[in-house]
């Protein structure tokens, strides 16, 4: 019988996601034209569906929008080739890329002519695709990938690394350690690229492990940071699980695994309305379960301001 639900804090929307959503809303509010968004604005189906209801059209490729259309790039960023293609077609361009992802792009442009670059990230992820479009890079996802680069890296040319902003802090440390062992001459950046929100949400989950039986992560299946939260929780609490919506909740799973104290967190692209719906359903299953903010939690205080000019 579930007795208590501890809420992790921070959880849910990060500053970059809020920035991207606000960006689209502001462009739409100031335009009478059809607004197109390339790819999912953030990796959450509920957010995308709500925008569709408000008239936003989502496309996977620029070819799906007419010449001269207003197109906004998602929070994950795009490669320079995509930007150039939009310009060639006379499109009005809005860039809702998270400022922390933009920072990684700037770093890539700065060093692309002087350094060999290893990119720590997930193949096929929208953010990785966009960043790797800035320069020639070697993608690594595992320790084995690093070993395979031995014959590809020139020891006589400077080497450094960049990383996807939504990675597991612990796993990335292991990869960086292996890079250092394999390539002792590597230049370490003064600061890693994992964003504050990813780090803080993982730290919040780690703090709860000794006080819970399992962690419930709310997030989309294609949300990298949500999957990292689940992996982190399962290392200590194997019965931890993830749902995308309240419909995914299973009372039987909680009962069968004898979960009495449940931690709850949400990925950085998960809206609060989903969190509220899932808590409500848990309370229907277990009316006597107490819902509490986990002691020692802290708020997410970062905020990004929208630029004065939204379209170029």
UniProtKB/Swiss-Prot annotation:
InterPro entries named among the record's database cross-references: LytB/IspH
Single annotated GO MF: 4 iron, 4 sulfur cluster binding
Catalytic machinery residues: 127 (proton donor)
Residues the entry annotates as binding (2E)-4-hydroxy-3-methylbut-2-enyl diphosphate: 43, 76, 125, 165, 223-225, 269
Substrates-to-products reaction catalysed: isopentenyl diphosphate + 2 oxidized [2Fe-2S]-[ferredoxin] + H2O = (2E)-4-hydroxy-3-methylbut-2-enyl diphosphate + 2 reduced [2Fe-2S]-[ferredoxin] + 2 H(+); dimethylallyl diphosphate + 2 oxidized [2Fe-2S]-[ferredoxin] + H2O = (2E)-4-hydroxy-3-methylbut-2-enyl diphosphate + 2 reduced [2Fe-2S]-[ferredoxin] + 2 H(+)
UniProt entry keywords in alphabetical sequence: 4Fe-4S, Iron, Iron-sulfur, Isoprene biosynthesis, Metal-binding, Oxidoreductase
Annotated cofactor note: Binds 1 [4Fe-4S] cluster per subunit.
One Pfam assignment: LYTB
Binding site residues for [4Fe-4S] cluster: 14, 98, 195
Cofactors demanded by this protein: [4Fe-4S] cluster
Enzyme class of the recorded protein, top EC level: oxidoreductase
Residues annotated for isopentenyl diphosphate binding in this entry: 43, 76, 125, 223-225, 269
Stretches of the chain forming a coiled coil according to its record: none
NCBIfam families xrefs: ispH_lytB (TIGR00216)
Function: Catalyzes the conversion of 1-hydroxy-2-methyl-2-(E)-butenyl 4-diphosphate (HMBPP) into a mixture of isopentenyl diphosphate (IPP) and dimethylallyl diphosphate (DMAPP). Acts in the terminal step of the DOXP/MEP pathway for isoprenoid precursor biosynthesis.
Family of this protein: Belongs to the IspH family.
Name this protein carries in UniProt: 4-hydroxy-3-methylbut-2-enyl diphosphate reductase
Organism expressing this protein natively: Leptospira interrogans serogroup Icterohaemorrhagiae serovar Lai (strain 56601)
Name of encoding gene: ispH
